[in-house]
Swiss-Prot record:
Its main location: nucleus. It comes from Schizosaccharomyces pombe (strain 972 / ATCC 24843) (Fission yeast). GO terms for cellular component: nucleolus. This is Uncharacterized protein C144.01. Residues 8-22 have a biased composition (Polar residues).
Length: 112
């Protein structure tokens, strides 16, 4: 920065500190005015809120996937339970067939 620019910047700073309302060329003052003149944009706010919700939802899903993962021992237990259910169903079917073989379910053979 040249000497002249540095001196003028220093003087502007001193003047703005003495009377902040007098100098309308101030950088921060322009920033404040620009902020006030900006129109209200609800679309952006809604989009930001949606992004935050989606982000939280994704984080929750990732966390649940990590914590709720089925361990190998749990998988074996589930397989054993399913096998027991299948064998029970198979036995019921076999029993029904056996009973049918003797004519229990045929109405012609039933004697009341």
């Amino acid at each position: 920065m040249s000497k002249l620019k540095a001196q003028s910047a220093l003087q502007k700073l001193i003047e703005s500190q003495k009377n902040p309302n007098a100098n309308e060329d101030g950088y921060f003052r322009r920033k404040r005015l620009a902020k006030k003149e900006r129109p209200f944009e609800p679309k952006k706010l809604v989009q930001q809120q949606q992004r935050l919700k989606e982000k939280k939802k994704n984080e929750n899903i990732i966390y649940l996937k990590k914590t709720m993962r089925v361990t190998p021992s749990e998988e074996k237990i589930h397989e054993m339970i399913n096998q027991k259910r299948e064998t029970k169903k198979r036995k019921r079917k076999q029993k029904k067939k056996n009973d049918d073989d003797y004519g229990v379910f045929e109405e012609d053979m039933l004697e009341l």
